Design a protein with these regions (language model features):
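Loop-rich non-cytosolic ectodomains and luminal regions
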Residues: 1-169
Length: 169
């Protein structure tokens, strides 16, 4: 990834072809359905065995959409970021702006990069502080900061299922 000047983001979320293909699996398409709309598919690609719409949130985008949140079970997602800040060694600390009733935990709470273009992953765990389902969609954000860059990832948590072809990233 090459970035410079005012478009320098600090961290980037790279999304690969397999991320998009997995997304199609998660929303219910099989290999034949994917081949009908995708120009090229890697020869070794197969839909994950446990594909279902619960995994739509795992596409490696900066934004996060959690559906079917009933307040009883936590929802876990993971993200991978690439350090493109140009400083090589740097540490990003996380801050979370969570809506009332939602607990958001980020693991780890710091990303320590030792070089440019290094990739690190983190996990976000969404749980309810009230153990009840949501009455409406709620919004918040996760922000990674190293003193030079702020990288914000907005999120939405919904009790809706998304089963009506309303898949949002």
């Amino acid at each position: 990834v090459t970035t410079s000047g005012p478009l320098q983001p600090g961290l980037v979320y790279e999304t690969r072809t397999t991320d998009y293909l997995n997304y199609l699996c998660y929303i219910g398409l099989d290999i034949d359905g994917i081949k009908a709309i995708a120009k090229t598919i890697p020869n070794d690609f197969a839909c994950p065995k446990d594909s279902n719409s619960d995994y739509v949130s795992n596409i490696n985008y900066p934004s996060i959409a959690i559906s079917k949140f009933d307040g009883k079970a936590s929802k876990n997602i993971s993200r991978t970021v690439t350090n493109v800040g140009g400083d090589g060694k740097t540490v990003y600390a996380v801050s979370v702006d969570a809506p009332s009733g939602i607990v958001v935990k980020v693991i780890p709470d710091q990303l320590t990069f030792t070089k440019n273009n290094e990739k690190l992953s983190y996990q976000v765990i969404f749980s309810s502080s009230t153990a009840t389902s949501l009455k409406e969609d709620v919004f918040g954000s996760i922000t990674w900061t190293n003193g030079k860059f702020k990288v914000r990832s907005p999120f939405v948590v919904s009790s809706k299922s998304g089963d009506n072809d309303e898949y949002v990233l």
